[in-house]
Swiss-Prot record:
Active site: H104, E434, R619
EC annotation from Swiss-Prot or TrEMBL: 2.1.2.13, 1.1.1.305
Record-marked site positions (Transition state stabilizer): N102
Species this protein is from: Escherichia coli O9:H4 (strain HS)
Binding residues annotated for NAD(+), in chain numbering: D347, D368, I369
Summary of subunit composition and partner proteins: Homohexamer, formed by a dimer of trimers.
Catalytic activity: UDP-alpha-D-glucuronate + NAD(+) = UDP-beta-L-threo-pentopyranos-4-ulose + CO2 + NADH; UDP-4-amino-4-deoxy-beta-L-arabinose + (6R)-10-formyltetrahydrofolate = UDP-4-deoxy-4-formamido-beta-L-arabinose + (6S)-5,6,7,8-tetrahydrofolate + H(+)
Top-level taxonomy: Bacteria, Pseudomonadati, Pseudomonadota, Gammaproteobacteria, Enterobacterales
Gene Ontology MF annotations: carboxy-lyase activity; UDP-4-amino-4-deoxy-L-arabinose formyltransferase activity; UDP-glucuronate dehydrogenase activity
Protein name: Bifunctional polymyxin resistance protein ArnA
């Protein structure tokens, strides 16, 4: 049976050996070039392929159409993936009549995603395993073909568990590959309600947070022990690595991170104490705990910290342009809730941020980005993170003022992007779900969905293509000039302070604000083209939490990524949104102050938006990247968002001349 194999690491080597032993004909192997910054303790797939006389390739992008065509020419009957590190596109998966199968190092549906070996140890699991499953477009989500359980002993560390998983994988493949070859397999669908997903880990993720229980810190040490990069902490600015540890149920009133004793080297934790059995100062040699204490100059009562002392005192400076807007003011609130951010903001008004104006770590200037270019350039240079949130993002303006949309949304933002390139500053840029346009995919995927818009004589697409071109410019600056960036795409965020009722009166607002105005004024709710268009509505609190995690950027996981931020479970048509809003309005305690409901009225889009408008029938996000990069998923139900948004706007209405 002819196969093409995607493989890396020890699992890749043993998978290839198992295929050959089972009589498969391997036409080609795709692998990765080794990362010079990674300690290569594992077998080389490339060397094995060369020794076996099998063609081997390591393309940067195996999903490029040229590689898809070359793989198609190989006519594989079945495809296998053994620890290949990139997602394989659906076009390749569909090339094999018998399907494609992946070996994953966990008991799916638990621990989908990256680094399951390390994550199960971090989380203190007592059992894991290996799974062979059918590959589908979504990562690690296909039907299960076979599984083998592996017990995790209390003294297991990453390398010992790795060896156990390799042994289990050999057994699993020996048992299962002949059955696949003969088409004699039983597949079991994964239970989505039991699925968990974890993102990529980097060396920077393994810092020891001493306020946590000793058992949690010990699990971290186990999860990244040699040959992984190791868990680490700091004495002042001196970094040291902990290679092995033990938990002590030591009852101490000492502050977490305090040295309780030198021999053994005991550190107070949030609960109990951690004994550092072996460790390493800086780039030195490994030594036992008490010698490490001497090397670091520790004495009883010394304090350890999770980051360098000089870093701990420095607040991250965040520049938010458009700080008074919907996202800007909510993000400011979230950042100021923490104690390590300094927020600098510019906008043409301050009504939504008035509650922050006296905050010691909030600095605001009233101004226009098209005028205050010198102020902006200075603050881009001064700050660490830049969020240019200024844009015209209301559909009626796309047809009413297309040139103004282009000038503000594209030209002004391009200037800010170039400042970030010039001063080598990190930019977090608000793309938009509008860039997907009329895409027909069930889920809009950041890395694979096509971006489809209408003809030039439909000016409603000027916002979409302006944002898309900026996305591409930012991506190119990242590739060619090292710009540190993340693009995020909000999907219909809703909540208090979304637009205002005055904007709705002139038609320049988002859907829910316009509907609320209709209820407040007793005018009919207009359903554009029947209101059957579906959207996925996202609570502003869920959206801001995801955006906050992008700013935090744990382990630099968000660098160079495009991340949809939306709630695929909160899908509703505009008509359904109106009905839910009406039901909430009718039971609101202020309802009696407002006129009777005037009903729904169907209107044509051309009469409402003007000529040149086209609508999109559905817009549902894939949030795979948000899971992977942010460990995030939305939690808030749409009805709760509607209730809170309505309540906010009703309480802004002057009721003095309303009937009681």
């Amino acid at each position: 049976m002819k196969t093409v194999v995607f493989a890396y690491h020890d699992m890749g080597c043993l998978g290839i050996e198992a295929l050959l032993a089972a009589g498969y004909e391997i036409s080609a192997i795709f692998t990765h070039t080794d990362n010079p910054g990674e300690k290569a303790f594992y077998g080389s797939v490339a060397h094995l392929a060369a020794e076996r006389g099998i063609p081997v390739y390591a393309p940067d992008n195996v999903n490029h159409p040229l590689w898809v065509e070359r793989i198609a020419q190989l006519s594989p009957e079945v495809i296998f993936s053994f620890y290949y590190r990139h997602l394989i596109c659906d076009e390749i998966l569909q090339l094999a009549p018998a399907g494609a199968f992946n070996l994953h190092g966990s008991l799916l549906p638990k621990y989908r995603g990256r680094a399951p070996l390390n994550w199960v140890l971090v989380n203190g699991e007592t059992e894991t395993g290996v799974t062979l499953h059918r590959m589908v477009k979504r990562a690690d989500a296909g039907a299960i073909v076979a599984q083998l359980r592996v017990a995790i002993a209390p003294d297991d560390i990453a390398i010992t568990l790795h060896h156990k998983l390799c042994h289990a994988a050999r057994q699993l493949l020996e048992q299962t590959l002949p059955a696949i070859k003969h088409g004699n397999i039983l597949e079991i669908a994964q239970r989505e309600n039991e699925a968990t997903c974890f993102g990529r880990r980097t060396p920077d993720d393994s810092f020891l947070e001493w306020h946590k229980p000793a058992s949690v810190l010990h699990n971290m040490v186990r999860a990244v022990a040699d040959p992984w990069p190791g868990a680490f902490s700091y004495v002042g600015n001196q970094k040291f690595t902990v290679w092995s540890s033990r938990v002590h149920p030591h009852a101490s009133k000492a502050q977490p991170g305090s040295v309780i004793s030198i021999a053994p080297l005991l550190i107070a934790c949030g609960d109990g104490a951690l004994e550092i059995v072996t460790g390493q100062a800086g780039d030195g040699i490994t030594m036992q705990g008490s010698q490490l204490a001497q090397t670091l100059g520790l004495v009883q009562g010394s304090r350890l910290n999770s980051q360098p002392a000089c870093t701990a005192r420095r607040r991250t400076r965040v520049l938010i342009l458009g700080v008074n807007g919907f996202i800007g003011n909510h993000l400011t609130e979230r950042l100021l809730r923490e104690d390590h951010y300094e927020v600098y903001g510019l906008d043409i008004g301050s009504d939504a941020i008035s509650r922050f104006l006296n905050h010691p770590h909030f600095h605001f200037v009233e101004g226009d980005i098209s005028i205050h270019s010198e102020w902006i350039e200075y603050h881009v240079k001064k700050c660490d993170v830049v969020l240019p949130l200024v844009a015209i993002a209301t559909p009626i303006e796309y047809t009413r003022n297309p040139l103004r949309v282009f000038e503000l949304d594209f030209e002004e933002n391009l200037r800010i992007i170039r400042y970030c390139v010039k001063y080598r500053k990190r930019i977090i840029f608000p793309s938009t779900s509008e860039v997907y346009g009329m895409c027909s995919d069930k889920y809009f995927d950041e890395d694979h969905s096509n971006l489809i818009v209408g003809p030039v004589n439909k000016p409603r697409w000027i916002y979409s293509v302006s944002k898309q071109l900026l996305d591409r410019v930012i991506w190119a600056y990242g590739e060619k000039e090292g710009l540190q960036f993340t693009l995020f795409r909000p999907f219909n965020w809703m909540g208090p302070r979304l637009d205002n009722l005055n904007a709705a009166r002139i038609g320049s607002s988002r859907a829910i604000t316009q509907l609320i105005l209709n209820l407040v004024e007793g005018s009919p709710i207009k359903l554009i083209d029947g209101g059957k268009q579906k959207r996925c509505f996202t609570d502003i609190r869920d959206g801001i939490e995801a955006l906050y995690r992008i700013i935090e950027n744990a382990g630099n996981r968000c660098d160079g990524e495009i991340i949809n931020i939306g709630n695929p479970e909160n899908e509703a048509s505009i008509e359904e949104l109106g009905e839910m809003l009406l039901a909430s309005f009718e039971k609101h305690p202020l309802r009696h102050h407002f006129p009777p409901f005037a009903g729904f009225r169907v209107v044509e889009s051309s009469s409402y938006y003007g000529k040149g408008y086209q609508d999109v029938e559905h817009r549902k996000p894939s949030i795979r990247n948000a899971h992977r990069c942010l460990d995030w998923e939305p939690k808030i139900d749409m009805q709760e968002t509607i209730d809170e948004t309505l309540d906010f706007f009703l309480r802004t209405v002057d009721l003095t001349d309303k009937p009681s």
